[in-house]
Amino acid sequence: MAADNSSSDPHAPGPQLSVADVVIVAVYFAVNMAVGVWSSCRASRNTVSGYFLAGRDMMWRPIGASLFASSEGSGLFVGLAGSGAAGGLAVAGFEWHATYVLLALAWVFVPIYISSEIVTMPEYIQKRYGGQRIRMYLSVLSLLLSIFTKISIDLYAGALFVHICLGWNFYLSTCLMLVITALYTIAGGLAAVIYTDALQTLIMVVGAVILTVKAFQQIGGYEQLAAAYAQAIPSKTISNTTCHLPRADAMHMFRDPATGDLPWTGMTFGLTIMATWYWCTDQVIVQRSLSARDLNHAKGGSILASYLKMLPMGLMVMPGMISRVLFPDDVGCVVPSECLRACGAEIGCSNIAYPKLVMELMPTGLRGLMVAVMMAALMSSLTSIFNSSSTLFTMDVWRRLRPRAGERELLLVGRLVIVVLIGVSVAWIPVLQGSNSGQLFIYMQSVTSSLAPPVTAVFVLGIFWRRANEQGAFWGLMVGLAVGAWRLVLEFLHPAPPCGHPDVRPALLRTVHYLHFAVALFVLSGAVVAAVSLLTPPPAGVQIENLTWWTLARDRPSGAKTGDGPASQKHAFWARVCSLNAVLLVCVNLFFYAYFA
């Protein structure tokens, strides 16, 4: 089967869309727009809280679905399946590890954020540490990361999928999704984003389940996958090398700390630091939890999202591995000329694993469903980024430039920022087309490991250590930025060598895994924060009131009911339900880790 498909050109126009495919895609867009318009009309959009935080009246189900959908952009669909095809199961740890930090978000971080009555994460930092320079730095850093990593990766992967599957013009498909996404984001604010995310989560899960079932029907079952993956070797290889061989530890989650591509030490400690930044301090994610009507709904949303985050192992990673088994000459190619033929990138074609599976296995009609799934993944991620970036710029940058700006002006600026983001995104497409598609997932993780740990250190110390002050936080961020940027520059100047070439990169890149580097950078930044804080005056007591775990007001305005009435009893009951579900969730997560260890 692989030989029969090895000569196909994914960049040529895909199969002709049937009437059923066209109808499914059209219905998806129509329903998506209808949900966006309905939620826009339903929500209050004429106040800052209504537009940016959905009036703080969201229930746990749409919050959980939105948390999941916001993190499952098209870049993750393509990237997880591609990494699964290239290296096996361990990449699923990036998804499963979210369980613990999502629980930390709801039980630790959100109570403090609600108590501090903030809208953005940099706003919390400004309240906690004082001054404006840290808040401005974090706002600008978040905006840049959104444009050049989140938006760029999702746009490239989503457009690549549609281009390969349907043969649509790359620019046309990208611009169409951008415009439709931006329309209801501009119109409805966070409420529209969360409700459309809930719809798109359903579409993503249903479509991915159908593809996974059909993929396993082709291969047999899990044991057959393990045996077949070990033999998924392309017909053309590079002599005297082993890069064409599947990893011996492909079916294991925990890998050697020194030789593993995803060492267990890095996946345990380094990933925790990076995941804490993403799930507990990143505006895109935290904004959803801040929209909850009370703390129980925030907890319920985190629990639902954590359960959903268990799915990508079976819905993305394993299908990627099956794709390599079925199409080893394309997905598993190692010879540069063969890879160039298969996907247009000399370094490898693992990122075509998911779209290749869709095109070869899905029948007419269902192929249109999978196109809708990828559009859902892309648009969910983009709506989240657009709305959160708009919030950051409006609340942290524009209000700083124009402190007397009224609500009408802030809302107008928030909508205009989305238009600017669209322009930057479209202008970035040629750069994405020239980038190395084989490095998308690694690129995203490397950037995160170099820039996120200092931010995590500042948030964690700010919440748990009352002595941390503004001078310590600022210099911790600056030192961390300098060291992280140094490694990033080295990575861009010295990319990983292709198969068959010696690794002559600097020792920092050759011997220190990016997940291990994240740990070192976190420790360094935290040490600088602590040292400078101890050498300078402590923050005043009023400055940390309601802003740290130890000074948190227990009567915080979280929507919690007090007293002995029915409302209070109901609130206490659901608080216990959330806690029991959290314990059950951790047990399920640990079981899966142990099973695939």
From Swiss-Prot:
Record key words, sorted: Cell membrane, Glycoprotein, Ion transport, Membrane, Phosphoprotein, Sodium, Sodium transport, Sugar transport, Transmembrane, Transmembrane helix, Transport
Gene3D superfamilies assigned: Sodium/glucose cotransporter
Topological type in the membrane: Multi-pass membrane protein
Catalysed reactions, semicolon-separated: D-mannose(out) + Na(+)(out) = D-mannose(in) + Na(+)(in); D-fructopyranose(out) + Na(+)(out) = D-fructopyranose(in) + Na(+)(in)
Function statement: Electrogenic Na+-coupled sugar symporter that actively transports D-mannose or D-fructose at the plasma membrane, with a Na+ to sugar coupling ratio of 1:1. Transporter activity is driven by a transmembrane Na+ electrochemical gradient set by the Na+/K+ pump. Exclusively recognizes sugar substrates having a pyranose ring with an axial hydroxyl group on carbon 2. Has likely evolved to enable renal reabsorption of D-mannose, an important constituent of oligosaccharide chains of glycoproteins.
Family: Belongs to the sodium:solute symporter (SSF) (TC 2.A.21) family.
Protein name per Swiss-Prot or TrEMBL: Sodium/mannose cotransporter SLC5A10
